[in-house]
A protein has these predicted regions:
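Helix-to-loop junctions at the C-terminal end of transmembrane segments
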Residues: 72-85, 293-304, 390-391
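Cytoplasmic helix-loop-helix junction between adjacent transmembrane helices
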Residues: 116-153
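Helix-loop-helix hairpin linking two adjacent transmembrane segments in secondary transporters
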Residues: 151-202
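Hydrophobic core of transmembrane alpha-helices in multi-pass small-molecule transporters
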Residues: 31, 111-126, 250, 332-346
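C-terminal ends and interior cores of transmembrane alpha-helices
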Residues: 94-107, 315-327
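C-terminal transmembrane helical hairpin of 12-TM major facilitator-type secondary transporters
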Residues: 257, 277, 283-289, 295, ...
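Extracytoplasmic
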Residues: 18-55, 73-76, 163, 259-265
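Extracytoplasmic gate region of multi-pass secondary transporters
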Residues: 40-44, 234-293, 382
Length: 425
């Protein structure tokens, strides 16, 4: 037993299981660390005005940041298996503080690429979705879907909810001051996790929440993290479920992070919607995303996850197609933001849960890391492609229509998916 066990409440003496404390710690760190992904997007114009760099020069590192965020997930899966959540959060926080400090003080383009492009993508990338998978898998038997929902919502909410505040701070005191929002918030959440966070319930003399029998601690992996990640991919690639989840989650990335997060503001500008209003629409999506994802986690514990995903993708596809053809007013966009926000990343809990059900509580999160990589690679392609399409055609309509149709294809694909067999823990 860990030496920290004495400092923690023994079994049966606390009404609140420490699993919920871990969810709270991971939620706070995920929200503030991923805010570093979203906040720079609303600072492009003031940075361009101060530094004299073009929008294109400032946008390219934004796409790199998003791609790195997704691409480092598979290796992060192996690292998380080998070293545990606490050490990985320690590494992530150090990278994040370095990236934000470099971004706040930058005057040269190499600082833009290294700080905003590389470090601010890598830092949340090594923990964000892995905490969403690993904490529920290790700490929960009961309410696992709800825990996944809470943590899954943190990622999208963090990237969106601080955008209006950052835009306002930038107008008042400059873009460098706006970057203090993720700096202060993530710094505090980082230190709190290092103080109170633990890798497993067994480290403090507990069993996972809802466990009816003692859950043994798996033997520590002896392979390096690259081998662990490749082994997870090898295990996943043998199953049809893996390819279906990777394909549909890539469509999730195309229709969320790759489209609306990056292009909703200029889409609104094409429709005559002021910048301030469109920035608040992203915040509304972020707030209702959290509600929708937590609700999705609750539903995952009660209903067939395959059919939940079919409904989620179907509603998202219809919403995107509607947005193209509707006579969109500010009120219409607000209604879209609420409805779309509820569905923005509601796909995460059932996707994670199906991964853990199929591949087990240890390997499942590492397999999901590869699925998540597909999500963000596709998002990065869409982010770039939608911008090029807009420049060539003068409209975002083809991009939004394509995303909507792909969502409907994803919805239909789950009707043919077999119920996964439960993998051993």
């Amino acid at each position: 037993m860990s030496t920290n066990a004495a400092a923690m409440p023994p079994v049966g003496r606390s009404r609140l299981h420490y699993a919920w404390v871990m969810v709270g710690l991971a939620f706070l760190y995920s929200v503030f660390s991923t805010s570093a992904l979203g906040v720079p997007a609303v600072l492009i114009v003031p940075m361009s005005q101060e530094l004299g760099w073009t929008i294109g020069e400032l946008s390219a590192p934004q796409g790199l940041r998003l791609a790195i965020f997704g691409l480092c997930a598979p290796l992060a899966g192996g690292l998380m298996l080998r070293y545990g959540p606490r050490r990985m959060v320690a590494i992530s926080g150090a990278l994040l503080m370095a990236g934000l400090a470099m971004s706040i003080g930058m005057t040269e383009k190499w600082q833009l690429w290294l700080g905003m492009g590389v470090l601010l993508g890598l830092a949340p990338g090594v923990t964000a979705m892995q905490l969403t998978a690993v904490i529920p898998a290790r700490w929960f038997v009961a309410h696992r879907g709800l825990a996944i929902g809470i943590l899954g919502g943190a990622v999208a909410t963090g990237t969106l909810i601080f955008m209006p505040l950052a835009a306002w701070v930038s107008e008042q005191w400059g873009w460098r001051a706006a970057l203090l929002i993720p700096t202060v918030g993530s710094g505090a959440a980082w230190l709190l996790f290092l103080w109170l966070g633990r890798d497993r319930p067994q480290d403090i003399g507990l069993q996972p929440l809802g466990a009816t029998a003692p859950v043994p601690v798996p033997a520590a992996p002896t392979s390096n993290f690259v081998q662990l990640s490749i082994a997870a991919l090898a295990a996943g690639s043998k199953h049809r479920t893996f390819w279906l989840l990777a394909f549909t989650f890539a469509i999730c990335g195309v229709s969320s992070f790759g489209l609306t997060q990056a292009h909703l503001v200029p889409f609104c500008g094409d429709r005559g919607i002021p910048l301030g209003v469109s920035a608040w629409l992203l915040a509304v999506i972020g707030v209702f995303d959290l509600v929708g994802t937590i609700g999705s986690g609750w539903l995952c514990d009660r209903y067939d996850n395959r059919w939940l995903l079919a409904w989620y993708y179907g509603f998202r596809g219809l919403a995107l197609v509607w947005l193209v053809y509707a006579d969109v007013s500010t009120l219409g966009l607000l209604i879209f933001a609420v409805v779309y926000g509820l569905d923005f990343i509601a796909t995460v809990p059932p996707t994670v849960r199906l991964s853990v059900q199929t591949f087990g509580q240890e390997t499942g999160p590492a397999v999901f890391a590869w699925i998540f990589a597909a999500h963000h690679v596709a998002a990065g392609v869409m982010l770039f492609g939608a911008g090029v399409s807009r420049d060539m055609l003068g409209t975002y309509a083809p991009s939004f229509l394509l995303a909507g149709v792909l969502c409907l294809v994803a919805a239909a694909s789950f009707t043919a998916m077999k119920r996964p067999r439960l993998a051993p823990a």
